[in-house]
Amino acid sequence: MALVFVAVLVLTGCGSGGASSQAPSATVLYRFGVVGNRGAISQLQLDRPTPVPGISGQVVQIATSNSDGYALTSSGAVWAWGVASYGELGNGEHPAYSTRAVKVEFPSGVRIASLANPMPFDGALAIDSQGHVWGWGLNALGDLCLSGLMEFRPSELPLSKVTLATGARTHSLFSLGGKVYACGSGEYGVLGTGSTASSSTPVPVVGLPNTARVTALTSSWEGSGALLSNGDYFNWGYNAAGQLGNGSTADSAVPVHVDLPAGVRQVFQGGSGPKNGQTMAILADGSVWAWGENGRGQLGDGTRVSSDVPLRVEVPHGVTFVKVSSGGYASYAIDRSGRLWAWGDNKSGQLGTGSGTTIATEPVSVGIRLTQISSTAQNVAGLQGSTRRP
């Protein structure tokens, strides 16, 4: 059983009130859902938010992997919590799991600037202030671009001047020098090289137009994507349920264009298994579009029918979404006022509604306000409060 929880990070004491010399209060982490460990019989069921101690400093970014959560603070430190058997906590230890956040141990002088989001399923990636990438955790498929099977502390990848990174169950993607690189398993063409060959070293993705820069990378279990500065979005990899969004169900080892309305602002891929996955895209007008597997209602269009082309999510009247995220069989959005909405599968409480509803095919209010949301598989983290950057 993997560690599954929904977490809410509540940032306190970071407003403009009080003396300017006062340090920000520590971040408080809450979790609920099912907490367990791989292969463990016992598990902890939490149906109400429960604090997780340990994070110190002002959190500026959050990220999730299959069984872990990560928080980057304004000082460049990274904190981790969750399953630790593969070294995912990055502190040299590997207990079953940790419900308390622990500090990831980078070499002296390394200051992290951003986290991959989502993270590799059983590992983690972070970009430092110099553009170097660090990875830790499980590297069984070469998806961390490292040579070892497991890394219990961060190791530097053979990449530099990296601006973006994202990970999944089988592979990772990086943007540097105007190009996109990938490593890991090449099954279904997920590396985007034109073949299904695997590579434990970074290889260039082929077929992306060079007329616009890459502004975001997306990934799911066996899918990849890139959003360009002109609003064009491209997918590649597995496609049996229409995950590529191009009107086909044929896999593609090269990027294919997804026909979306103008004004795409954010895209997020989800999926927790080798044969599922969905993608959410949010436009400047607040509308949300989704495509791919829909067996649990995760597309949010009121049905449970998969789609190989983008469909419009049934957004409640008067609500404008500004951020989206997508996990295993569930999807999430934050509206203009900060309210969190969720839809899809809820068997592990990952919708966070506290209700007995097992499936929601349209967005439902979670009853909490957030500024950031991240989800991977059944693991969700949210940040509440002001930060120094989005």
Predicted regions: what is each one?
Residues V10-G13:
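C-terminal motif of bacterial Sec signal peptides marking the signal peptidase cleavage site
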Residues G15-G17:
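Bacterial signal peptide processing site
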Residues A23-P49, G82-R100, W136-R153, G184-T201, ...:
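Short glycine/serine- and acidic-residue-enriched loop/turn motifs that recur at repeat junctions
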Residues R31, D68-A71, A80, D122-A126, ...:
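Conserved core positions of repeat-based scaffolds
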Residues T50-Q58, K103-V110, L115, S155-S160, ...:
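Short loop/turn motifs that recur once per blade in beta-propeller domains
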Residues T361-P390:
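Blade-level signature of beta-propeller repeat domains, shared across WD40, Kelch, NHL, RCC1
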